[in-house]
Amino acid sequence: MQMIGGEMWTAAGRRLHQQRDLHAILRTAHRRCCTRPIGGGLDAPAAPPGDLRTLSGVGMLIHQFKALLAPKKIYPWRSSHLQSLEVRRLHTAPSNAAAAAAVTDGGDQDKTKSAKDDDGDDKVQCKKEKIVTATKKGAAVLDQYIPDNIKTAYHVLQVGDEIYDATMNQTNVGGNNNKFYIIQALESDAGGNFMVYSRWGRVGTRDIHWSYRKGSHCYAHKYTWLEMDYGEADKETNKKTSSITNQLEETKLETRTASFISLICDISMMKQQMVEIGYNADKLPLGKLSKSTILKGYDVLKRISNVISGADTDRTQLEQLTGEFYSVIPHDFGFKKMSEFIIDTPQKLKAKLEMVEALSEIEIAIKLLEDDSSDQDHPLYARYKQFCCDFTPLEVDSEEYSMIKTYLTNTHGKTHTGYTVDIVQIFKVSRLGEMERFQKFASAGNRMLLWHGSRLTNWAGILSQGLRIAPPEAPISGFMFGKGVYFADMFSKSANYCCASEACKSGVMLLCEVALGEMNELLYGDFGADNLPNGKLSTKGVGQTEPNIAESKITDDGMVIPLGKPEKVPSRRGSLMYNEYIVYNVDQIRMRYILNVNFNFKRWG
């Protein structure tokens, strides 16, 4: 069965306040539905989208909600009281591709244009973002395509701790499916009237029960329940973000610091960057990301990694696991064939790992922006305080600024010729508590000032919680030298991890003092390198090119700044072009400087 749009069922009757009465009705409804199909035989046609059906009360409402949650075919509860209200708006309202077109189980025609990147890989063309106002009444946000007259009179039903709102996703790579299903049980604000609302791209199959939604795994050809965070509404987050970006002149922060905080706290930027790498923020809005969803994404990637690294790669298993990942972490592929997006190489796995890492940082940033404990402060100043960092802008004519500019210029690798970088601002930075934790490693020796780069989306999380090591759920194969924090002595090696683009040229870089101690030097990658030999404090991935050691600067307290011009070391024949430094204890890291830069991309004729 294929449908476009949505359906609504109404229920007239008083709400049952005693839990046992509700359970009794549900048991009765369950028996009736299990003994015979509702509304006819197995081949009976379903009601067309837009019907409003009368149900007998909240019990029938909840039963219908749960029945629709994992439908094979939808048989609406039959009643003699058919309401006349129509919801044609659901048919005509602009929607995403999945809701606006019927998708078949077979291959879909490619109706989207694609661009080629420098390596010849297809990239999904970025679509202009449409801003949709969310309406939150009660615990959850009403779906954006519910008619306005319903929004003004109804809210999402909540019974105890149960919030009857579900967003589901199903991706089946082999069948070229990438489908969503949204369902909400609605109660009138005045009480006594109820509705079930649903919107979908295609209808799925049974077998995931509402009671087991949180602990359920992904199954082939089944919908996967996406856990939402029912914290502050997106509307509030957007309001605070707007205040941050539009009121720079009112803050008591120094102007350069205020501009930087505004840059890294921009939710619109975060959404756009995620859209550019394929994430579908319409199906699972960034503001509703839950920690458990992110950990599930890591877990699926870990299982994909195990298959890829196995002796015999099972293509069928990779298809199933890829579908599971896209069900947990929704993507927007337009109408491209799903077979093009199977995660079957270490490179594709690493790209998805970086996406989930970015989503993890965004989840932290969203929580910061929703925190209203400092509402008496200007929004920018409130965010500044949450970072627990002191930022001191460096003057262009200062010795420190000159030293850092030299370090940046000298260590731009010859193989990274696709861009140049302009410094916007450099800040001296100090995180609360870092110096004290770092002190126990200060006597270990071999302290270096090294580069670290990351996506612009990640910096609110990094500055508020510090640099962190990937969780146990993350696949170890995504990290060349095991799970740790990675640094470089070549600026451009770290700058590449900023993932800047023509659409977003801003980047942020850290210079950290890192207590390396005695290093375990490796010429080739080793996923188990985090199990350091006795006496070693860090790993050095030895590159063929490094800054001239003789030109390094040593500070008064003994920290080495490798700002010399790069030179090739003939005796080195490893797999790395440039050095990498990895520590596995975040107490060995002390942030010293943070740079805001602009990337200038060269155009090739």
From Swiss-Prot:
GO terms for molecular function: NAD+ poly-ADP-ribosyltransferase activity; NAD+-protein-aspartate ADP-ribosyltransferase activity; NAD+-protein-glutamate ADP-ribosyltransferase activity; nucleotidyltransferase activity. Belongs to the ARTD/PARP family. Residues 250-370 form the PARP alpha-helical domain. PANTHER family: DNA LIGASE, POLY [ADP-RIBOSE] POLYMERASE 2. Residues 153-260 form the WGR domain. Keywords: ADP-ribosylation, Glycosyltransferase, NAD, Nucleotidyltransferase, Nucleus, Transferase. The lineage of its organism: Eukaryota, Viridiplantae, Streptophyta, Embryophyta, Tracheophyta. Pfam families: PARP, PARP_reg, WGR. This is Poly [ADP-ribose] polymerase 2-B. Residues 96-122 are annotated as: Disordered. Residues 108-122 have a biased composition (Basic and acidic residues). Coiled coil: none annotated. The keyword Cytoplasm does not apply. Involved in the base excision repair (BER) pathway, by catalyzing the poly(ADP-ribosyl)ation of a limited number of acceptor proteins involved in chromatin architecture and in DNA metabolism. This modification follows DNA damages and appears as an obligatory step in a detection/signaling pathway leading to the reparation of DNA strand breaks. Residues 378-605 form the PARP catalytic domain. The keyword NAD applies. GO terms for cellular component: nucleolus.
